[in-house]
Amino acid sequence: AGSLQPHGKPRRQGQRTAAVESEQVFCLLAMDTPKSFDAEAIRDQKVKLLKETKPISTDEVLLGQYTAANGKPGYKDDDTVPKDSNTPTFAAMVLHIDNDRWRGVPFIIKAGKALDEGKVDIRVQYKEPEQQMVAEVARNELVLRVQPDEAIYVKSNTKLPGQDSASVPAELDLTYSKRFKNMYIPEAYEALILDCIQGRHSNFVRDDELLASWAIFTPLLHAIDEGKVPYTTYPYGSCGPEKLNEFVAKFGYQYDKNYVWPETDVAKYADKI
């Protein structure tokens, strides 16, 4: 997730907020199916998952702090920020779950300020089959776009129309605003406030869930405060630190730099095949 506007300076409170928000998305993706839609059943599964998640290793973290670029000031250019501040404005980290379902599968969480776009999404990238019929195609992905423009789409590869057997990237797309054109889709905080008014607790953090979450994140935050975790810089309005692609590649994620979503003109790939 990221935003072109800093939206305030991410002091310790900002770090905590980002951690809790990321933890909620992580839980909803990885937790076991609850016994029912009852709020306590859902929150029980969140707590169970968090207790099975290992504390974040400082060796599996990439931190960044934005600098002045594109006519915008850097983080330390703010008069209220100490010139020697080591507060990160970007973080990529890896979570590991120690249970039979997810053991060995890395979960990469990324969040930052002053990036090129603001979005929240979940990307499940699938490995290539052991015997792949078509060489050099991008991996398939299931993408859940939380905001903006809620959507679920599957990145896949399809045969280019015509006599050629070449494969090109495409997607199966369910964008909510297109599928449900005549229905009002509430904003995130609208739905949350309505849940609060109606006494629905499933989207709110329980005390034991918060404690389990901090057992994962707090050691890392202490290490950052003590200057034990180095950080790099990135320009305001960029997609993050230069080493980001190298970092995620260490954990098996492959970034397809040529892919855009939504893809409406796959014919452009014909000249590159």
Q: What role is predicted for each listed range?
A:
Residues 1-273:
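Secretory/organelle targeting and membrane-embedding segments
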